[in-house]
Regions:
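Active-site activation/catalytic loop segments of kinase-like enzymes and analogous catalytic loops
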Residues: 230-261, 277-293
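Activation segment
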Residues: 62, 115, 217, 225-227, ...
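All-alpha amphipathic helical-bundle segments outside canonical DNA-binding/catalytic cores
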Residues: 262-274
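A cross-family kinase active-site recognition segment
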Residues: 119-176, 196-198, 298
Length: 323
């Protein structure tokens, strides 16, 4: 279904009726039960169908991804599912497509899956997750994603700095130092990152995007999938340089290398990638600050203490990179 309407305004004012209209456009029928789920970037709802099944409908934030970029994600999920990876591919909406449009907003429906988020994993769970990631990367390396970005310093440092400094989010007295340390990190990591082969990866594989069910891990939420180094999908699961983090990475890699070789030299990118994520995520909040749901969710974002703590963390990373 394609209708007229200003997409951004429609996105902020989605109603249950419009959600149900979107689900039913291809012939599916709903009971009327529609539950909003916690999500910041997109609007996500759980909808009950007449047959008792439940689907999760994601309305993509206008301007975030193009139609082609979302279909790149859907294609990757379809390939992973065909290779029997534990992922949740999108449903055909009954129109012959996995991507719909209503009021100018693109949307996708997924079958609901059940699982738990585990904050701590035992060694065997880490090895099992590592095997799953290795299999995912083996599929991801088979081809590219022409409409998805590459993980690089332009996207993760330079463009975010324009948003943060140009929008006045970093306090005036701190802004020059914040810019300098971010650029220092960018300068240290640009060439090593560019020299590392990029392939299709999840991109945001933190513990909250891994559900654990009876059959093991299920990888969910590929919204940030992009072209990048495989190590990006590992460091978020075992952050830092503590003994515990090192053991976690060792377990993940033990499982990973059952299915695929891993370039261990790229582990040196873990801390630089963490720095890139810090700057990128702050710019993400800044870009969404006019969304009514963001200020209450991030109340410290406009406080000087938030930025000083972030600056000090970036300094620690930069000093370790460029002593």
């Amino acid at each position: 279904m394609t209708t007229t309407g200003e997409p951004r305004a429609s996105f902020f004012s989605l109603t249950p009726d419009r959600v149900l209209d979107a689900v039913e456009v291809g012939g599916l029928r709903c009971t009327g039960r529609c539950l909003p789920l916690r999500a910041f970037e997109n609007r996500v709802y759980e909808v009950e169908l007449d047959d008792g099944k439940r689907v999760v409908v994601k309305f993509h934030r206008p301007g975030r991804w193009s139609r082609e970029a979302i279909l790149d994600e859907h294609a990757f999920l379809a390939e992973l599912a065909a290779a029997e990876l534990p992922v949740v591919p999108p449903l055909d909406l009954g129109t012959g497509s996995t991507l719909g449009e209503i009021d100018g907003i693109l949307y996708t429906a997924f079958p609901k899956v059940r699982g738990r988020i585990l904050d701590e994993l035992d060694p065997e769970q880490r090895r099992r997750l590592g095997r799953t990631i290795g299999r995912m990367h083996a599929v991801g390396a088979a081809r590219g994603a022409p409409h998805r970005p590459r993980l690089d310093v332009a996207r993760y440092i330079h463009q975010p700095l324009e948003v943060l400094l140009g929008g006045g989010f970093v306090p005036e007295g701190l802004a020059p130092r914040y810019r300098d340390v971010a650029l220092r990190i960018a300068g240290a990591v640009a060439l090593p990152l560019a020299a590392t082969p990029a392939q299709r990866i999840h991109g945001d594989l933190h513990p909250g995007n891994v559900l654990w069910g009876a059959e093991g891990p299920i990888l969910v939420d590929f919204d940030d999938f992009l072209m990048g180094p495989p190590v990006q999908d590992l460091w978020l699961l075992a952050r830092g340089d503590s003994e515990e983090a090192r053991r976690g990475r060792a377990d993940l890699l033990e499982g990973y290398e059952v299915f695929r070789e891993f370039d261990r030299a790229t582990l040196a990118l873990c801390e630089p990638l963490r720095a890139l994520r810090i700057v990128f995520m702050s710019a993400w909040i800044a870009r969404r600050w006019d969304d009514p749901s963001f200020p209450p969710a991030f109340p410290m974002f406009r406080h000087a203490n938030y930025w000083m703590q972030e600056y000090e963390e970036l300094i620690r990373i930069a000093d370790a990179l460029t002593p």
